[in-house]
From Swiss-Prot:
Keywords: Conjugation, Plasmid, Repressor, Transcription, Transcription regulation. This is Transcriptional repressor TraM. One of its GO terms (biological process) is negative regulation of DNA-templated transcription. It comes from Agrobacterium fabrum (strain C58 / ATCC 33970) (Agrobacterium tumefaciens (strain C58)). The gene is traM. SUPFAM superfamilies: Transcriptional repressor TraM (SSF109631). Negatively regulates conjugation and the expression of tra genes by antagonizing TraR/AAI-dependent activation. TraM may either bind or modify TraR or AAI making them unavailable. Alternatively, TraM may bind tra promoters preventing TraR activation.
Length: 102
């Protein structure tokens, strides 16, 4: 029979978080998860603002590259990476905590 950790690591995106959070009190894990959700929300807003500021030719994909476009891409990478952390923390926690708007 597989251990609980082995089963969990098969279901999560960022397996190192399983080890990093092992043994944490549930309240601490919930706080980490809520903070990660809030950070993700900020990153979504930032990426959206940068996308909205792009010229239409970039939004439509007719043009690519350049400093402004790269800033948007970097923000999107950060946002998606944070979403992986959020998803993993929610899997470890076992539920989606109530993360009120900050």
């Amino acid at each position: 029979m597989e251990s609980e950790d082995a089963t969990l690591t098969k279901k999560v995106e960022l397996r190192p978080l399983v080890g990093l959070t092992r043994g944490l009190h549930p309240a601490d894990l919930e706080k980490l998860t809520i903070d990660a959700i809030r950070a993700h929300r900020r990153l979504v807003e930032k990426a959206d603002e940068l996308f909205q500021a792009l010229p239409e030719s970039y939004k439509s994909g007719k043009e690519v590259g350049g400093p402004q476009h790269l800033c948007y891409i970097e923000a999107s990478i950060e946002m998606h990476a944070q979403m992986s952390a959020v998803s993993t923390l929610i899997s470890i926690l076992g539920y989606i905590p109530n993360a009120t708007v900050n």
